């Protein structure tokens, strides 16, 4: 794998098999904050419970943890990752208030980990196969590799599974605006809308409907 610097100065990795980077060239930190943290309104939630598909380099978690640390609220975070990266790869600095807590967390992975700031769990495996808790999440970060190279992670069966893991009214955010992904989200029980992006393409948000 090859390290690359994104436009906001934060690093990402290029995956040679998927032939994609873990983050957009416009900015790893920018996407984590604008799309996932703010797009799901997790930055306003009094006790967020986040489910992430595609933990990757942990940037979304680190940005979310910084937000909860600064606000003095507890974070419950469950991540799914098919190909977890080594600790020494994940331990890069981002200049965030959460850097120290993240380094301490790495020593205890895969966990689960209880800490003064909250709770973290990492499910290692294919999202189609791992068992997810029902009615857990106030927010879902849907961030696997793209539908073009990793369509299985975006299938209807997976999205129905995510809906069951979501609380009613939970917010889902993803960078993909592919038509078939949006249709699958609707079929799975999410109200779908476009989310403005500072870059060329809009993102996608969903709200978990009552069943």
Tell what function each PLM region has:
Residues 1-47, 57-70:
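Class I SAM-dependent methyltransferase Rossmann-like catalytic core
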């Amino acid at each position: 794998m090859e390290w690359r610097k994104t436009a906001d100065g934060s690093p990402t990795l290029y995956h040679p098999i998927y032939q994609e980077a873990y983050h957009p060239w416009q900015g790893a930190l920018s996407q984590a904050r604008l799309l996932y943290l703010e797009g799901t309104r997790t930055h306003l939630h009094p006790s967020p419970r986040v489910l992430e598909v595609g933990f990757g380099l942990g940037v979304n978690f680190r940005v979310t943890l910084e937000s909860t640390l600064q606000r003095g609220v507890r974070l419950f975070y469950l991540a799914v990752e098919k190909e977890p990266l080594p600790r020494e790869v994940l331990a890069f600095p981002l200049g965030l208030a959460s850097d120290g807590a993240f380094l301490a967390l790495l020593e205890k992975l895969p966990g689960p980990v209880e800490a003064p700031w909250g709770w973290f769990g990492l499910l290692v495996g294919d999202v189609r196969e791992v068992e997810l808790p029902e009615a857990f999440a106030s927010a879902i970060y849907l961030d696997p590799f793209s539908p073009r190279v990793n369509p299985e992670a975006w299938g209807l069966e997976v999205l129905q599974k995510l809906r069951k893991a979501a609380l009613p009214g939970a917010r889902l955010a993803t960078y993909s605006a592919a038509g078939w992904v949006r249709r699958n989200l609707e079929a799975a029980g999410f109200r779908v809308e476009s989310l403005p992006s500072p870059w060329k393409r809009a993102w996608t948000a969903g709200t978990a409907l009552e069943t």
